[in-house]
Amino acid sequence: MEMLQGLLLLLLLSMGGAWASREPLRPWCHPINAILAVEKEGCPVCITVNTTICAGYCPTMMRVLQAVLPPLPQVVCTYRDVRFESIRLPGCPRGVDPVVSFPVALSCRCGPCRRSTSDCGGPKDHPLTCDHPQLSGLLFL
C-alpha cells in the first residue's frame, strides 16, 4: 500500500511540474505594441506613434515581517535591448529642433528599474494626452 501511495505521489508531483511549465495565466514580461504621444516644447503639434514597449508580470516577493526586516528590492518589466527611432514634428518654428526620438523595445527582462532611462512610476491616468493639437500620421526620418 505504501508503495502505491509513493507512486501516486511521484505521479502527481511530476504532473505538477508539467502544469507549471505551461504558459502562465498572466503574461510574463515581453514586448507589446503600444501607441505613444510625442510632442516637444516649442512645437505646436503632437503626433501618436506605434512602437513596442515592455509590459507584463515579473515575480516579486514581500516579507511577512515587514516592520522588522528591510523591504526586498522589487523588479519591474524593463528593456533588455532597445533601439531608438526618430520622427520630425511638422510646424516647429525656426530655431527649434523638430526631431524627437522614442524607444522601441526589442527584448525585455525583469530587473530593477533604472531611473536614468525609465519612468519608474505607476500607470498614468492619461498616457495619450497632449498639450498641443494632435496630428495623425507619421513623419519618420
Swiss-Prot record:
> Which molecular function GO terms apply here?
hormone activity; signaling receptor binding
Report the Pfam families cross-referenced here: Cys_knot
Q: Which CDD domains match?
A: GHB_like (cd00069)
Question: Where do the record's glycosylation annotations fall on this chain?
Answer: N50
Which SUPFAM superfamilies does this one have?
Cystine-knot cytokines
Question: What span is annotated as the signal peptide, if there is one?
Answer: 1-20
User: Example GO biological process term?
Assistant: male gonad development
Which keywords fit this entry according to its UniProt record? Disease variant, Disulfide bond, Glycoprotein, Hormone, Hypogonadotropic hypogonadism, Secreted, Signal
Superkingdom as given in the UniProt entry = Eukaryota
Annotated compartments: Secreted
The family assignment reads: Belongs to the glycoprotein hormones subunit beta family.
From the record heading the sequence, give the disease linked to this protein.
Hypogonadotropic hypogonadism 23 with or without anosmia: A form of hypogonadotropic hypogonadism, a group of disorders characterized by absent or incomplete sexual maturation by the age of 18 years, in conjunction with low levels of circulating gonadotropins and testosterone and no other abnormalities of the hypothalamic-pituitary axis. HH23 male patients have normal sexual differentiation, reduced or absent Leydig cells, reduced or absent spermatogenesis, and absence of spontaneous puberty.
Protein name as it appears in the record: Lutropin subunit beta
Species per Swiss-Prot/TrEMBL record = Homo sapiens (Human)
UniProt lineage: Eukaryota, Metazoa, Chordata, Craniata, Vertebrata
Q: Which gene encodes it?
A: LHB
